[in-house]
């Protein structure tokens, strides 16, 4: 295949190659998750280390997401993904090598810095290279691939960790670096062509990147981002408590964890490729998201009242489906509300609010669990209901704006 044929092939199949690389990255990103508790125990680190390291990675993800959104505009999603996947791979190698809590925290902070760029670029590439008609479907597909292959990555990491923890980290880093090469080579150019010469280091101040959000921020956007923050907080608090709860309350052994991850992945696949796509094509997303968020809140509150295993699992399955659906719906709302000029910054801010919710949810679950094992579910349900109220306000505000236009 000559150079011209290769370029033609990459141009024609860039989205298929993008989703293949997304699946591979989501797979590799989760190899280390099931072995992290074992690594912490082997190093005799304090019990709070797991939550602290998770929050550390989420913190730099949050802090630098708007920064990476600006770099997407300058360099293009393909280059940012290439840089960030390689950087993430190096961060995970350092995670495996370090032996003390402070040095491991530095490795996690480094990984979080690059993960922010990956998450932002996933969204910006879809927005920049798809039509308005296909954007919602592709966002749902991206969310599906991320969730489903994360579950399989968790399973693979668990099995590989039994053989060797260093081998698992080496495998993870190798696949992440491979993903970086695929993204850099196979994706279409989507950077903004400008005559300005801008230094990346001059823009490296993450707080300036947040201040630059004033270019697009309105009260309507602020309420939408508040809903993103609340839902991310709720989902993270739920996730952090769920595995501990089923082991503590129902005495499930550790083998059920991988099985449940696989079930979650399968449910997400079905929900996103059927219900979510139907909502985006056939309904008003601004209105439909209200019912999805409300349903998620009600199911979580119902979970706190269930004592038997079977009803508990069934209601959780309903929540898994709703939890899978709301993410691409909120992504689509943020993308639809942004102009072409500010789309990268908007999605960067979206990822920042999602990451901030991850930090808040992890810390909240850690503290509230001591007061009661079901309280994380209860408050996560309340957070979803409050986000539903924010979605109602957003829907009504949008309706008034159309009438006044």
Task: Walk through the language-model features, giving the residues of each.
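Residue-level signature of mid-helix packing/kink "hotspots" within the transmembrane helices
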Residues: 58-66, 150-151, 265-273, 358-359
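Helix-to-loop junctions at the C-terminal end of transmembrane segments
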Residues: 64-76, 161, 271-284, 369
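Juxtamembrane intracellular "pre-TM" segments in multi-pass secondary transporters
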Residues: 2-12, 190-224
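Helix-loop boundary and gating motifs at the non-cytosolic
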Residues: 9-58, 223, 232-249, 257-260
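A late C-terminal transmembrane helix in Major Facilitator Superfamily
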Residues: 340-371
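Paired small-residue
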Residues: 91, 102-110, 310-318
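Cytoplasmic helix-loop-helix junction between adjacent transmembrane helices
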Residues: 107-148
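Structural signature of the two symmetry-related core transmembrane helices
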Residues: 79-94, 287-302
């Amino acid at each position: 295949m000559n150079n011209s044929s290769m370029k033609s092939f990459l141009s024609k199949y860039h989205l298929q190659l993008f989703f293949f690389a997304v699946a591979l990255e989501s797979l590799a990103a989760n190899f280390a998750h099931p072995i992290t508790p074992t690594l912490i125990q082997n190093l005799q680190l304090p019990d709070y280390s797991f939550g602290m390291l998770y929050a550390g990675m989420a913190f730099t993800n949050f802090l630098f997401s708007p920064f990476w959104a600006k770099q997407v505009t300058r360099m293009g999603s393909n280059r940012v993904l290439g840089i960030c996947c390689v950087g993430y791979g190096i961060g995970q190698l350092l995670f495996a090598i370090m032996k003390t809590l402070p040095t491991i925290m530095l490795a996690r902070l480094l990984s979080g810095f690059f993960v922010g760029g990956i998450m932002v670029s996933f969204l910006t590439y879809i927005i920049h290279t798809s039509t308005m008609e296909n954007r919602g479907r592709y966002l749902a597909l991206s969310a599906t691939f991320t969730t489903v292959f994360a579950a399989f990555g968790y399973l693979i990491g668990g099995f590989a960790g039994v053989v060797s923890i260093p081998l698992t980290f080496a495998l993870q880093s190798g696949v992440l670096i491979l993903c970086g090469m695929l993204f850099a080579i196979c994706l279409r150019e989507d950077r903004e062509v400008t005559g300005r010469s801008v230094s990346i280091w001059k823009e490296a101040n993450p707080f300036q990147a947040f201040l630059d959000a004033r270019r697009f921020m309105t009260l309507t956007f602020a309420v939408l981002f508040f809903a993103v923050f609340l839902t991310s907080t709720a989902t993270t608090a739920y996730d952090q408590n769920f595995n501990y709860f089923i082991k503590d309350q129902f005495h499930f052994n550790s083998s059920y964890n991988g099985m449940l991850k696989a079930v979650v992945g399968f449910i997400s696949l079905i929900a996103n490729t059927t219900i979510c796509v139907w909502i985006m094509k056939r309904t008003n997303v601004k209105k439909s998201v209200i019912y999805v968020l409300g349903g998620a809140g009600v199911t979580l509150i119902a979970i706190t009242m269930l004592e038997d295993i079977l009803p508990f699992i069934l209601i959780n399955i309903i929540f898994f489906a709703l939890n899978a659906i709301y993410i691409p719906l909120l992504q689509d709302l943020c993308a639809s509300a942004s102009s072409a000029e500010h789309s990268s910054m908007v999605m960067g801010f979206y990822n920042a609010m999602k990451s901030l919710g991850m930090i808040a949810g992890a810390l909240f679950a850690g503290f509230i669990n001591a007061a009661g094992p079901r309280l994380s579910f209860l408050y996560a349900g309340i957070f979803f209901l409050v986000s539903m109220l924010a979605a109602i306000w957003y829907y009504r505000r949008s309706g008034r704006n159309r009438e006044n236009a």
